[in-house]
């Protein structure tokens, strides 16, 4: 090695060219995820331990409900982990988007303005049930959330009172990266109760997320956004009138990002990284109007609800749309469902591998074991 090369390294000057990389740097793997099912436990839900060097970022409660008149309700609350590493809490209250009084999609309902902020909320284990409660002296309508490995409840004073059972098992996925990444833990619950006094049925995600210190989903250290990986990200479930159920996660992205997890009413789970598809952004170029998706040797389609656009969230990089996933040609009649997810129009409408020298991933048939 020449002295001139040593000098460049010592002074910290980069020896890399300005051309776009064709393979990952050390510590990156081309944005390949790792996914599987898992068994939810009280111990794990109570713990504040880090996974893969990522502390808890927050617990996300969110879902889709429909009343007897077909009106749609999408509630959401982000509960920070309460650690010193937490990012500033910019989503501090209960939010509810609904089609009530609107024909063009879901708008923000004012009930959230009077909800209690997350400041000082508590997390306790009482018997075999975990409780999250708003601070008793905090101003606003209180909240109370409970969880066990089998059931949960979510109460927002003067707004919502729902409860239900886990669609088993849990699902989780990990996206490694040297500076940005995510570990996402998904618990889907089938729920019923009342929202704004209306009887409703639907599904929610009860999902802890882990990110590098200071990270916050969609904002900082989120590779799906800052690396422009994400094309499609949906958590979804459908129970049919014959009692069968499909549920899972469907993602699609650039480079090596993308996977599908699929479960059924027997608790059987399959997962694959061999996925592809295309998003139809229509003439508007922003709101997706349908998705074609290939996984497990089947063709799938996302059917947006005619009023499924969450316009109340404002203009986003990843506009949110609710609807329903199904296999192409599936004639089963849905009974209760949710598929609230997103597509990112600025990232493209179909996958692109921007790392052509990464190498070829070869699948393994684990059935041989």
Language-model-derived ranges and their functions:
Residues 3-369:
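Targeting-peptide/extracellular-domain and disordered-appendage signature
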């Amino acid at each position: 090695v020449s002295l001139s090369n040593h000098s460049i390294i010592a002074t910290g000057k980069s020896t890399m060219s300005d051309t776009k990389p064709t393979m990952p740097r050390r510590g990156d793997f081309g944005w390949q995820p790792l996914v599987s099912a898992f068994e939810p436990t009280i111990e794990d839900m109570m713990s504040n331990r880090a996974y893969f060097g990522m502390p808890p970022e927050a617990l996300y409660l969110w879902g889709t409900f429909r009343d007897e008149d077909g009106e749609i309700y999408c509630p959401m609350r982000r509960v920070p982990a309460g650690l010193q590493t937490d990012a500033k809490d910019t989503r501090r209250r209960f939010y509810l988007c609904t089609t009530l009084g609107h024909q063009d999609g879901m708008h923000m309902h004012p009930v959230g303005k009077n909800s209690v902020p997350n400041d000082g909320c508590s997390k306790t284990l009482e018997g075999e049930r975990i409780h999250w409660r708003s601070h008793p002296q905090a101003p606003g309508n209180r909240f109370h959330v409970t969880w066990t490995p089998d059931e949960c409840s979510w109460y927002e004073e003067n707004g919502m009172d729902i409860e239900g059972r886990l669609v088993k098992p849990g699902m989780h996925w990990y996206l490694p990266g040297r500076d940005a990444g995510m570990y996402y833990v998904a618990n889907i619950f089938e729920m019923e109760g009342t929202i704004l006094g209306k009887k409703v049925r639907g599904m929610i995600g009860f999902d802890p997320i882990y990110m590098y210190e200071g990270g916050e989903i969609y904002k900082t250290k989120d590779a799906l956004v800052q690396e422009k990986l994400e094309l499609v990200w949906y958590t979804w479930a459908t129970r049919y009138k014959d009692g069968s159920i499909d549920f899972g996660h469907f993602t699609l992205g650039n480079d090596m990002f993308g996977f599908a997890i699929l479960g059924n009413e027997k608790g059987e789970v399959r997962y694959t990284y061999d996925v592809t598809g295309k998003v139809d952004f229509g003439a508007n170029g922003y709101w997706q109007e349908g998705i074609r998706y290939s996984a497990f040797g089947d063709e799938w389609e996302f059917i947006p609800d005619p009023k499924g656009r969450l316009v109340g969230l404002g203009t986003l990089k990843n506009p949110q749309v609710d609807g329903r996933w199904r296999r192409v040609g599936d004639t089963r009649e849905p009974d209760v469902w949710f598929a609230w997810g997103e597509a990112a129009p600025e990232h493209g409408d179909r996958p692109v591998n921007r790392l052509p020298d990464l190498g070829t991933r070869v699948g393994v048939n684990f059935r041989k074991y």
